[in-house]
Amino acid sequence: MSQSTYSLEQLADFLKVEFQGNGATLLSGVEEIEEAKTAHITFLDNEKYAKHLKSSEAGAIIISRTQFQKYRDLNKNFLITSESPSLVFQKCLELFITPVDSGFPGIHPTAVIHPTAIIEDHVCIEPYAVVCQHAHVGSACHIGSGSVIGAYSTVGEHSYIHPRVVIRERVSIGKRVIIQPGAVIGSCGFGYVTSAFGQHKHLKHLGKVIIEDDVEIGANTTIDRGRFKHSVVREGSKIDNLVQIAHQVEVGQHSMIVAQAGIAGSTKIGNHVIIGGQAGITGHICIADHVIMMAQTGVTKSITSPGIYGGAPARPYQEIHRQVAKVRNLPRLEERIAALEKLVQKLEALSEQH
């Protein structure tokens, strides 16, 4: 499908979903549900936006099967999916939106590539990028302007390294990895020993950083190498901007770390963990699989059971909810205590009179 306009029926066939409505409706773009016009396809994933369904002018709306049962009587063109509507909408983006190319195909003459480096086929290396000795860049990789691939480091096939990324020496980047601008992978960890004279002496860090397949790393995120063991981000994990991952940390498979979170050294994060924005996790602990940490959670000890945690120190969400409810009741409790104190004073006065 290479054209830019599709009928509702064509899209349903391409997306492998059912549709309700006029199959001949022509669609030529994508838009949010509030802004969509008759030529646009949109989606409903979060029920908070269901209030826009009735007034939406969208030519077609992707919804889940459950949502369709609720809203089928609105007389709209619906594409009905058993998957997340957002995921199906993403496939539409790939149809309608043409990626912006950097305009620098192949290897730019200003790129600096060491004679011992191995560059596979179909690689794009933009202006002023540097590939150091014995580095290996896999096939169909893209290395952005001003990025550095350190000595003895590897970048797996179909990975996309955006401009001004620093991948230090002896770092392993897997296949289909995306690293956003300004990220630094493989810096020395923040490890020091204090001498008898109170001076802080930096410790050499000999470990590597290993980034497995299908990982995404946000802008200005830093992942430090371990002192002896490796720092590892397992397959499929997604890391937001401005995240700090310290030395010898292991992040499990398909986990998500939101902006400004920090993980101290030698901590092990399980699989399918979600770490909220500005959360802080101390070092040398373990986080179980399927843990969700709310924003600004402060984790001071290991979490051994799946669940939702928040607060500082971290505790189960239900406990926080109960505590918040009690805090809300404090003004009323204060009034009741004041009334009781007055009553006690009256009783004491009566007692003294008798």
UniProtKB/Swiss-Prot annotation:
Q: Which HAMAP family match?
A: LpxD (MF_00523)
SUPFAM superfamilies hit by this protein: Trimeric LpxA-like enzymes
| Family, similarity comment | Belongs to the transferase hexapeptide repeat family. LpxD subfamily.
Q: Give residues annotated as binding hexadecanoate.
A: 240, 244
Q: Which GO terms describe its biological process?
A: lipid A biosynthetic process
Q: Which InterPro entries match?
A: Hexapep, LpxD, Trimer_LpxA-like_sf, UDP_GlcNAc_AcTrfase_non-rep
Taxonomy, superkingdom: Bacteria
Question: What's the source species for this entry?
Answer: Chlamydia trachomatis serovar D (strain ATCC VR-885 / DSM 19411 / UW-3/Cx)
The protein's name in its UniProt record: UDP-3-O-acylglucosamine N-acyltransferase
Q: What is its EC number?
A: 2.3.1.191
Citing just one GO molecular function, the answer is: N-acyltransferase activity
Task: Please indicate if the UniProt record lists Glycoprotein as a keyword.
Answer: no
Q: Which CDD domains match?
A: LbH_LpxD (cd03352)
What is this enzyme's catalytic activity, as reactions?
A: a UDP-3-O-[(3R)-3-hydroxyacyl]-alpha-D-glucosamine + a (3R)-hydroxyacyl-[ACP] = a UDP-2-N,3-O-bis[(3R)-3-hydroxyacyl]-alpha-D-glucosamine + holo-[ACP] + H(+)
